[in-house]
Amino acid sequence: MPAFAIYFLAALAEIAGCFTFWAWLRLGKSGLWLLPGMASLAIFAWLLTMVDTPAAGRAYAAYGGIYIIASLCWLWVAEGARPDRWDMTGAAVALAGSAIILAGPR
């Protein structure tokens, strides 16, 4: 599976897992929300191990840009708040950084 696809799936799993904690602590949802949230966070961690790189830190660093894009998508789709131009500019810079990390000659 291509790294971008892994990172995209990992971002969805991480955001969904973290949102369950947000829902529990900030929105008053039941603590039972944490069960699928913890499973989702475990899937997130497992997915990052599938990236073809010898160094975990590099996989995590490259993932950061994808996470930012996915978070802004979550903001828009799940929370109904449209990202502004500063959000999009920051995301573009982060995504460029991820691309440099992933594609750099080694």
Curated annotation (Swiss-Prot):
It is found in: Cell inner membrane. It is a multi-pass membrane protein. Its main location: membrane. One of its GO terms (cellular component) is plasma membrane. The keyword Metal-binding does not apply. Keywords: Cell inner membrane, Cell membrane, Membrane, Transmembrane, Transmembrane helix. InterPro entries: UPF0060. Belongs to the UPF0060 family. This is UPF0060 membrane protein Smed_0659. It comes from Sinorhizobium medicae (strain WSM419) (Ensifer medicae). The lineage of its organism: Bacteria, Pseudomonadati, Pseudomonadota, Alphaproteobacteria, Hyphomicrobiales.
